[in-house]
Amino acid sequence: MPDQKLLITGCYGLIGTILWEHLADSFELYGLDIHSREPKDNIFQADITKPEQINNTLGRIPSLTYIVHLAGDPRMDADWDSVYSNNIGGTKNIYEAARLHGIKRVVFASSNHTTGAYEGLPPSLHTKDNPNLITINDPIRPDGFYGISKVTGEAIARMYYDLFGLESICLRIGSVLRDDNPHSNPRYESTWLSHRDLVQLVKKSLLADVKFGIYYGVSKNKRRFWDISNAVSEINYQPEDDASHSLRPQS
């Protein structure tokens, strides 16, 4: 049985369920979600906007090492009040609880929407051949309140590392699709992050020697416009899938 304990917040969401299925062999898994399903000893119902609920959950998991923080409002068009409470306040609450409980590392689900305005409004960069790659060194250009909330989450992660030594990896996640099919939308040909590349990226983010980093989460798509060279060199991310090579569903 794995000896390192991992808590996944937002464990019932799309990314949470993918990670839960594929990381169970590597970590002793625990989950946190605002929604309730069948009772399980290793999944806790909690609201991340309520610090006492987070602290109570972490207090019930002795020797917890890692957190993958996915919980929050995932809507790209979410209003300010929601992202302020759930994504900004909720992320701050997770990091503060992690600090208080001696967690080693948090992997924070940031988003490509931290720099979404580079794609154009509405997005059109995916229609261009050989565009300049967007890197983590480019200035932030969020394309809405959701993007702002993820920029703020990255800043929270940085502060908790600099002030308290709480290790963090921030992943600017691309398009993770329920059916794992990048051909349902032209933009996905550029932005798709396959399920197996997602799992690899998160696992390597948890175990890498790097103490803090920000990386784009995207497969090795021929038409991608996000730079992953730092993820390759720093955490040994080796994406296996390319939207241009994936099988199209039979009509």
Predicted segments, located by residue:
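Conserved Rossmann-fold NAD(P)-dependent oxidoreductase catalytic core, especially the SDR/UDP-sugar
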Residues: 93-140
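N-terminal Rossmann NAD(P)H-binding glycine-rich loop of SDR-like oxidoreductase domains
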Residues: 4-25
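Catalytic helix-loop patch of NAD(P)-dependent Rossmann-fold dehydrogenases
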Residues: 85, 121-168
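Flexible, glycine-rich beta-alpha linker
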Residues: 114-116, 145, 163-189
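NAD(P)H-binding glycine-rich loop region in Rossmannoid oxidoreductase-like domains
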Residues: 38, 48-86
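Conserved C-terminal active-site "lid" loop/helix of NAD(P)H-dependent oxidoreductases
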Residues: 213-215, 220-238
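Alpha-helical substrate-binding/gating segment
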Residues: 162, 173-180, 192-213, 220
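Glycine-rich NAD(P)-binding loop of the Rossmann-fold in SDR/ketoreductase-type enzymes
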Residues: 49, 66, 82-93, 101, ...
